[in-house]
């Protein structure tokens, strides 16, 4: 017997999540009939908040950044940082004279985004003048779909029996809250998305949702909150909270149930539901209503031996206890939640009291529903993957993150798929199943090795969520179009338990359009899409492994051997001769005090030596050197070591390098991708030099993520850029990473640092924290890096291009704190060694000193 599930529309709004990992659903859906809540779907949000996407700065940068479309979709909340980056030349302006509300003020302008260092007109984004580029830019396809839909308007709902939409009143006047909602969707500090896969498969948006969450604010009149794409609803009765107070309800469902609840006597029949409440000062209980994936069989014995229970826990992994206030009718359960807490986990299970023969498992007493969800990309491509998800309940989210996608025999980073359709069927007992897929269209085929997949009996008994992948491909070079394929589920040597067909979505718009054009028109289209700006020709020098010639040396006046080793500091005996990289000095904290240090080389190691512990001599005065040879390769390998431990913003790195590197082939060769050729770019439709550079960077990112235990993306990229003599670009990247990492290390200590750097007042400090405050009115400890980063970026912007001064002043300020983080975190000291060694590296390693 087949049971076809009805499709639900997704509902939601932008909301501040309770942790960085919480992801918010942002599409429109069902409304509440009980509260005066204003509906605000995403199109309205964009059109009615022009100040949230304000154009500032020089419009010429639109041309400068060909990756704007991707960045504005992934990081629209970085607009204020952009302002600072564009205005860095204002070196003489005191930070104390500026508006402390820099990161939360409203700006009166409109109709554009501002993110990651460049500006873009939204209308220009919608026009998509380049057919090729539009094919690559489907990382913003979800945003384009939203902007295209302008017909929706604000409306107020006063009835009491509709589903509650989010209260957006608090967002309307809080620009930072909107930005923070985006931030909770995108993990800012360490982006590990497979951007190479995204660029090849338009429609797998870079800012996709990893899991569905809904958060609503309900007043004393009550209402209902429904999890999108589900039959899971929490009803808030009238009088639940006092007049003037609000209850914030957040719902999230996990497909994988707790494993300890699945065994012979028990099986879960619903997803694990997380309910988070913002107000525990309540007067009425909540009512949970949800559909479950099983019914007790009608025979008297099953009715006596089996019970459907709702289990409750304060932790995701248990322990769980049975709730008594439950009512079940057919496949629906209602649970009265009396003992409320801020975080609750609930799951429904069928439990048997005993298993007398011939019963073997709980399955013998119930009609168990098994569901299959078919997931794929938003648009189909000449080659794409379909994922079949099998679970023991009827909840299938509209989007699903798959983390074990394979490419070239290797696992790549997680990819988000869209729900194409779902089907449910009854299974009498757990048993081995085989799933087969057949294309109903001769233009498409399923890879032979992937036509049939197996699901084991033990996986069904354990309640596991099973993902099976099927690879489709276009036959030869036929026309792209949507098509049907058939899915069949059958046990060994038995009749199929389920058989149904699925229709794919449309092809990627640019592929569909170009595939329908005659050959000569396609050629014209390619010419029309060619870049207008001339290619910048730069001849990069070749890195040479030469022996360093030191002009200055130092003879140590005493021995320094530390019991507790300190990274980046030299140890030496009295009378040792240390080669000095120059006469410049670095200020940094040592064992306990801030001192001045030379950067030197001793016994093949580069590090700091206290200025007062050495007597500087000339090269002619050197009598004995323990280091006979120290080459530029040795220098490069050591000075970049701190970069392995620095945090970075991937989108910023991608933008800067793509703009400042003008020869993709040189970059590819230095990174070890000399096998890449122009034919590789034909597959991804990369015409501009910057797009090819971006492709190389994304490939490096993907490879480093695959081998993340042994390879570090920022480290390898900086090494390559230094070998190309791109020192200005390297300095910019290093400063960006050092500032962000310092903010993360500081956390709540940023206030003390701000006072030491620029003597901020208490009111000015609070201005930085206001945008990041949670429901309690305070900034969570794990979120303290955000106001710290806002402040440090504002402060560093006033230095312009004086990156050495930024890093040195930051080091000195951190050292002066009561409990300096730099006593344990020495990477900033290592970065100071790096920037003070760049000139020596350039003079020796390159035959020319031209700046790039």
UniProtKB/Swiss-Prot annotation:
Keyword Nucleus: yes
Organs and tissues of expression: Preferentially expressed in metastasizing tumors.
A GO MF label: growth factor activity
Biological process per Gene Ontology, one example term: positive regulation of cell division
Keywords linked to the UniProt accession: Activator, Cytoplasm, Growth factor, Mitogen, Nucleus, Phosphoprotein, SH3 domain, Transcription, Transcription regulation
Record bears the keyword Phosphoprotein: yes
A Pfam family per the record: UPA_SH3BP4
Location(s) in or outside the cell: Cytoplasm; Nucleus
Domain SH3: 549-619
InterPro entries: DEATH_SH3BP4, SH3_domain, SH3BP4_C, UPA_SH3BP4, ZU5_dom
Chain ranges of the ZU5 domain: 212-349
One GO cellular component term noted in the UniProt record for this chain: cytoplasm
Chain positions found as Phosphoserine: 19
Subunit comment: Interacts with FASLG.
Role, per record: Acts as a transcription activator for MET and as a key regulator of HGF-MET signaling. Promotes cell motility, proliferation and hepatocyte growth factor (HGF)-dependent scattering in vitro and tumor growth and metastasis in vivo.
The protein, known as: Metastasis-associated in colon cancer protein 1
Gene: MACC1
């Amino acid at each position: 017997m087949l049971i076809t599930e009805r499709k639900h529309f997704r509902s939601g709004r932008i909301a501040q999540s309770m942790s960085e990992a919480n992801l918010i659903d942002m599409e429109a859906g069902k409304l509440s009939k009980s509260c005066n809540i204003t509906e605000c779907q995403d199109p309205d949000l964009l059109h009615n908040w022009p100040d949230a996407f304000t154009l500032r700065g020089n419009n010429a940068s639109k041309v400068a950044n060909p990756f704007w479309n991707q960045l504005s979709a992934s990081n629209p909340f970085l607009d204020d940082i952009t302002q600072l980056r564009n205005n860095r030349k204002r070196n003489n302006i005191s930070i104390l004279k500026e508006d402390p509300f820099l990161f939360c003020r409203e700006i009166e302008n409109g109709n554009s985004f501002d993110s990651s260092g460049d500006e873009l007109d939204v209308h220009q984004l919608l026009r998509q003048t380049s057919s090729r580029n539009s094919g690559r830019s489907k990382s913003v396809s979800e945003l384009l779909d939203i902007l295209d839909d302008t017909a929706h308007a604000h409306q107020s709902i006063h009835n009491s029996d509709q589903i509650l939409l989010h209260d957006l009143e608090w967002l309307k006047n809080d620009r930072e809250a909107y930005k923070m909602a985006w931030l909770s969707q995108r993990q800012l500090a360490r982006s590990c998305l497979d951007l190479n896969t995204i660029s090849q498969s338009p429609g797998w948006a870079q800012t996709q949702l990893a899991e569905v969450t809904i958060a609503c604010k309900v007043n004393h009149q009550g209402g209902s909150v429904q999890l999108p794409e589900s039959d899971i609803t929490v009803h808030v009765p009238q009088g639940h909270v006092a007049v003037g107070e609000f209850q914030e309800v957040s719902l999230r469902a996990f497909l994988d149930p707790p494993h300890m609840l699945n065994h012979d006597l028990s099986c879960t029949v619903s997803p694990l539901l997380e309910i988070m409440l913002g107000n525990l000062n309540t007067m009425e209980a909540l009512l949970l209503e949800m559909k479950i994936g099983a019914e007790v069989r009608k025979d008297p014995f099953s009715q006596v031996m089996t019970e459907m229970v709702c289990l409750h826990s304060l932790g995701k992994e248990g322990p769980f206890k049975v709730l008594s206030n439950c009512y079940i009718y057919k496949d629906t359960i209602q649970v009265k939640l009396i003992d409320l807490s801020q975080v609750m986990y609930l799951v429904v299970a069928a439990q048997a009291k005993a298993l007398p023969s011939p019963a073997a498992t709980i399955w013998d007493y119930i009609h168990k529903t098994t569901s299959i969800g078919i997931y794929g990309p938003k648009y189909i491509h000449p080659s794409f993957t379909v994922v079949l998800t099998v679970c023991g309940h009827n909840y299938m989210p509209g989007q699903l993150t798959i983390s074990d996608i394979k490419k070239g025999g290797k696992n790549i980073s997680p990819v988000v798929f869209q729900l194409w359709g779902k089907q449910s069927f009854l299974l009498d007992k757990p048993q081995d199943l085989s799933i087969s897929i057949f294309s109903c269209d001769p233009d498409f085929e399923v890879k032979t090795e992937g036509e049939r997949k197996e699901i084991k009996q033990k996986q069904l008994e354990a309640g596991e969520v099973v993902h099976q992948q099927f690879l489709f491909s276009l036959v030869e070079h036929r026309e792209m179009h949507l098509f049907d394929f058939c899915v069949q589920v059958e046990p060994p040597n038995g009749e199929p338990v389920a058989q149904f067909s699925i229709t794919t979505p449309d092809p990627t718009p640019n592929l569909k359009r170009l595939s329908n054009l005659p050959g000569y028109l396609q050629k014209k289209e390619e010419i029309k899409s060619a870049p207008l700006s001339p290619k910048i020709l730069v001849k990069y020098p070749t890195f040479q492994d030469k022996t360093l010639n030191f002009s200055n040396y130092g003879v140590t006046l005493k021995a320094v051997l530390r019991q507790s080793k300190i990274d980046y500091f030299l140890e030496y005996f009295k009378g040792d001769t240390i080669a000095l990289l120059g006469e410049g000095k670095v200020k940094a904290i040592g064992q306990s005090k801030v001192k001045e240090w030379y950067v030197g080389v001793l016994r093949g190691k580069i590090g700091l030596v206290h200025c007062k512990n050495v007597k500087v001599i000339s090269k002619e005065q050197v009598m004995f050197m323990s280091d006979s040879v120290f080459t530029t390769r040795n220098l490069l390998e050591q000075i970049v070591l701190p970069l392995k431990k620095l945090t970075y913003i991937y989108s910023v790195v991608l933008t800067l390098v793509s703009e400042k590197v003008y020869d993709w082939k040189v970059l590819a060769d230095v990174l070890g991708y000399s096998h890449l050729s122009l034919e590789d770019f034909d597959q991804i439709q990369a015409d501009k030099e910057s797009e090819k550079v971006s492709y190389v960077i994304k490939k490096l990112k993907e490879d480093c993520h695959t081998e993340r235990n042994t390879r570090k993306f920022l480290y390898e990229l900086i090494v390559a850029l230094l070998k190309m003599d791109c020192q200005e670009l390297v300095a910019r990247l290093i400063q960006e990473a050092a500032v962000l990492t310092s903010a993360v290390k500081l956390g709540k200590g940023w206030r003390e640092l701000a006072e030491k750097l620029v003597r901020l007042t208490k009111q000015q400090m609070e201005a930085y924290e206001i945008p990041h405050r949670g429901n309690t009115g305070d900034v969570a400890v794990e979120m303290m890096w955000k106001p710290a980063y806002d402040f440090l970026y504002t402060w560093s912007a006033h230095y312009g291009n004086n990156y050495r001064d930024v890093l040195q002043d930051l080091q000195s300020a951190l050292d002066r704190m009561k409990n300096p983080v730099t006593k344990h975190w020495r990477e900033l000291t290592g970065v100071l060694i790096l920037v003070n060694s760049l000139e020596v590296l350039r003079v020796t390693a390159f035959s020319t000193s031209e700046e790039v």
